[in-house]
């Protein structure tokens, strides 16, 4: 899972798994279905397929279209990205930002419970992500500042508003703890769903600081 992370790791000999299993041939994990209120995407569906499907909400489709390059988008899958939970991956922010349900081989897991830190999830040993169900929002948008070489998010923010007015804001690429919900922004946007209502940048404490940007810089980009 997470080939955009896994392949560079293998090339650098930072990881040496004894076995690699290809899940792309499992037909039950390869479809996209919609019932109007939600859309379910199989774990083996590629980023390209998500990007080009008319059943996928526009914000999620646009997110998928901005992942990696064409080679990555035609091979990489939503299930692999979600299971890998790279701290700079885009899909985790959509899962949290839309209140998705992760379908695993061991059962269903709410996105709020699934992502537990950098490269850490609620998946049990030997479990895989078989699909993800996303509620269809009334409004949503995803914006990211891109690391030019990898196309990962230096910082990415997914914002949604449901038909009942409920707002979720999720941030990827910024925190040492991985993807997180920005509750201050959620509370502000719940009262006034406009750019003017977005609060000042979150605290830089706990933000990633590396060669791509300091913690303070990432906090600034979030807002």
Residue ranges and their predicted role:
Residues 1-223:
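C-terminal structural segment of proteins
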